[in-house]
Amino acid sequence: MSEKLYPVLPEAKKNTLIDNETYLEWYEESVSDPDGFWAKHGRRIDWFKPFTKVKNTDFNGDVTIKWYEDGVTNVSYNCIDRHLKSRGDKVAIIWEGDNPYIDKKITYRELYENVCRMANVLKKHGVKKGDRVTIYLPMIPEAAYAMLACARIGAVHSVVFAGFSPEALAGRIVDCESTFVITADEGVRGGKPVALKENTDTAIDIAAKQYVMVNKVLVVRRTGGKVSWGRGRDLWYHQEVASVEPHCEPEPMNAEDPLFILYTSGSTGKPKGVLHTTGGYLVYASMTHQYVFDYHDGEIYWCTADVGWVTGHSYIVYGPLANGATTLMFEGVPNFPDQGRFWEVVDKHHVNIFYTAPTALRALMGAGDEFVTRSSRSTLRLLGSVGEPINPEAWEWYYNVVGDQKCPIVDTWWQTENGGILITPLPGATDLKPGSATRPFFGVKPVLVDNEGNVQEGVADGNLCISDSWPGQMRTVYGDHKRFIETYFSTYKGMYFSGDGCRRDEDGYYWITGRVDDVLNISGHRLGTAEIESALVSHHSVSEAAVVGYPHPIKGQGIYCYVTLMTGADAQDPDELRKELVQHVRKEIGPIATPDKIQFAPGLPKTRSGKIMRRILRKIAEDESGALGDTSTLADPGVVDDLIENRQNKK
């Protein structure tokens, strides 16, 4: 843990929206009078019918979470229409293509027309309020248009990251019974095409076998690559939008009407459809965007995430646009054409606020400072980090080399389930400690509990829970409220359990220590070990598999797989079989789930009741076999010796 303290920079303090005094005052009000506080801040968005009820939440029993429940509004209206009068000609989205010579600026007025046209196309093909629309698009402006068009007509979008495989896409189509898909002919990433339409066709075939029929596929022409065509089903986006009006009335939505479903990995099998609703989500996303990034009108803001992840939803699209900001969307990758790309984009578009993930920073740090220092970065004012805890070395590099010691770093902790940032510094209010997410945002009440559920006071380590609701919180797991309660509210009664471990220091600062359940954090993206295990076991040579994380210098965590083979399968060349299994997992889930290490084992360490002792597997994967603890409960302690002997990452 870093003991270094970086006081608030004078420059950051000078123009800040929130200084320390204001933070302490607002925070106190937000936790002592949540109704009064959130009533006031709920008015930051426009309501067609104002709310009279603010907070109606209960973390016990059947768990109900409702905010502003009698208010009526529309997210698309708040992100576009209400800005037209005062800033219609202001740039809403700067799009930077994969190719550094291609970019596009879209004003709020152009955004309005594009979104209205797409909304009218959806309506023309029978999409109604409450219908689920699957969006499987690269980082192109049409991805934002599609999300906002769904919000405009009251359809519920489910964005699937364009790096996911056809199998993963199919699972998400089936779970929410989506009959309309929006995709592109191909994506472009690092100069290479990504076969999105082909993947979509495969996914639709898989979904059909599970009796979910996709009726229409709207295809954006991105590359002009050759694609197969389903007559009567497939529609070209450019042809469809040309035939409809550029105006579409926003559907009046109740604050608790669903806005989107976003699938996230859990510690058990299939991904969970996290459901966010309309009013509270937008209040929270826009408020955190404004105050965490200390956003001032006219600034250029860039979050490098993909819209396939929650960070892209809240901090590329909804938060910034609700605030009338200029938000940058980047199609490419940090190392194409070379490792200086991020900083060239910063210079090219005069970026003031930059928000990225530690995994990208670690990779760029390894490439050397000259890729950074050849750019000026003189417009940068604030840096942010998201996705996983940032190690102090990467933090220092980010602060000293990228930010030239003049940009505060907001190290933000939050999750898909949270809708927006929960623990974070505020640039004009919070002294910084490298590696610490520091203090809770307004209305957020973090609690550390031990494994028995006892609340820990003062300096402590524990499981991170939140003891009361905030407006951006997810409402349920789509179609499975029981799973929602079991996952988040059954471990510690009356509290939301994050699944993360955490330490609180003597200044009341929070330090996230990583997952405490069977979920991996790979490059800032969550993957369930059960998901990867079931992909491995679906291969004909594999009898059993156990997956754990281990420290990885770039990705934060790497994927370590222990595999027991079917009888006879061990006759295969182990290196060939490893390659085959890696490809198999990539096909089942996507490149994000590529195993880093595969260890073949005659057996796995199990208790007499048949439970795999993951703690032991984790220690071996971390090359800490001296710290295995008690192995006396194992059915066959001899298995452990073989695992240690053949471990894949001996130091």
Curated annotation (Swiss-Prot):
Gene3D superfamilies: 3.30.300.30, N-terminal domain of ligase-like
EC number: 6.2.1.1
Organism per entry: Brucella ovis (strain ATCC 25840 / 63/290 / NCTC 10512)
Cofactor(s) this protein cannot do without: Mg(2+)
Keyword terms of this UniProt record: Acetylation, ATP-binding, Ligase, Magnesium, Metal-binding, Nucleotide-binding
Residues noted as binding Mg(2+) in the record, renumbered to the chain: 537, 539, 542
Coiled coil: none
A molecular function (GO) term: AMP binding
Record-given protein name: Acetyl-coenzyme A synthetase
Homology family: Belongs to the ATP-dependent AMP-binding enzyme family.
